[in-house]
C-alpha cells in the first residue's frame, strides 16, 4: 500500500503480485530501463589492438543490497570494449544466476571504483527518468521479485539462471517518482531503527555472556560462596493477590 494505509487498491493483473495501489503502474521492466550485458573472459587480441587492464565485477561481488569490493579482479580488454562495458553511476547490478538465493539479487552501483566493468553473468540495468535505481534494487529483494525470478529461471542441479529477456519482462509495480523517493526514505529510516535495536540487543547479550562467564569463574575459584544460593521462584505474587482460601 505504499505509505498510505487507506489508499485505494486495484488488481495488478499478475497473480503472484496481487493488489497494488490504484494510482501505481504495473508494466514490464523494459518499459522503464535497458539492460547491458557484460564481458566474457578469456578473449585474446591481435598485437595491433589497443588494450587496457581494468577492474571488473563478478557474481561474487554483487551481494544482496551491496557491492563486495574485497575481491575485485582485473581483466584486459580492448579500448572499445572498455567503453561498452563500463558501469555508470545509477546502474542496478543484478546476477544472472547461481544458487536460487543469489538469483536476481541486486544493488545500485555508486561509482565505488573508477572505470569498472562487469562480467557477462552480471546484468547492468539502466533505469530511465521514471524509475529510481533504488526502487528497482529494493524490488529485486522483495518476495514478489524472488518468486518471478524462480518461476522464469532455468533450473539445474543446485543452480539457476535467468535470461535477460525474462528479466526485462518482469512486471514492475511503480509509483510516481516522488512517491518512490518518499518510500525509499521511509524504508531507510525504519531499517536504521531496526539496525539500532539489533545492535542494542547484541550488546546486551554480549554483556550477559561476559557476566555469566565472570560468575562461573568466581564460583569455581572460590571467590564467592554459592552453597546457600537458591533460585528465585518462577511465580511470585504480591500479598494483595492472595485471597482467602488461596494456598499460602
Predicted regions and their residues:
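A short glycine-rich beta-alpha junction/loop motif
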Residues: 115-123, 154-182
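Short, conserved charged micro-motifs
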Residues: 131-135, 178-181
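Sequence-specific dsDNA recognition surfaces
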Residues: 13, 30-46, 60-92, 235, ...
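Short, ligand-facing micro-motifs at secondary-structure edges
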Residues: 63-74, 92-118, 134-138, 147-152
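Non-catalytic DNA-recognition/assembly elements of restriction-modification systems
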Residues: 8-41, 169, 173-181, 185-196, ...
